A protein has these predicted regions:
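A short, Lys/Arg-rich alpha-helix, primarily the initiator
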Residues: 1-27
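Short alpha-helical DNA-recognition segment
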Residues: 25-45
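Amphipathic, hydrophobic secondary-structure cores in small proteins
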Residues: 42-59
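The alpha-helix within a helix-turn-helix
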Residues: 22, 33, 62
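Short amphipathic recognition helices of helix-turn-helix/homeodomain-type DNA-binding modules
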Residues: 71-78
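DNA major-groove recognition helix of helix-turn-helix/homeodomain DNA-binding modules
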Residues: 56-71
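Residue-level detection of the helix-turn-helix DNA-binding "recognition helix"
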Residues: 23, 37, 48-50, 77
């Protein structure tokens, strides 16, 4: 059986959820980068798919946005 959730889909879900959560909280990527201890270039490179975030960074993002890591990877409908 083929796994239908491939890398590109998973990256898109993560990106969409981070953007949605930032919008809901009226926060920016600059704010997120400061809160997780990175610079804005790092976040921009993540968005352009130029690097893969470490598990440590994903956990920090979830903590700062006050969601579970699983929530970051769960596709939201609508």
């Amino acid at each position: 059986m083929k796994n239908t959730t491939n890398y590109e889909e998973t990256r898109k879900i993560l990106e969409d959820n981070i953007n949605r959560l930032l919008n809901e909280k009226d926060r920016s990527m600059a704010w997120l980068s400061r809160e997780i201890g990175t610079n804005e270039r790092y976040i921009a490179r993540l968005q352009r798919d130029e690097l893969v975030p470490s598990l440590q960074v994903i956990c920090k993002i979830a903590e700062v946005l006050r969601v579970s890591v699983a929530d970051l990877f769960t596709k939201k409908e609508g």
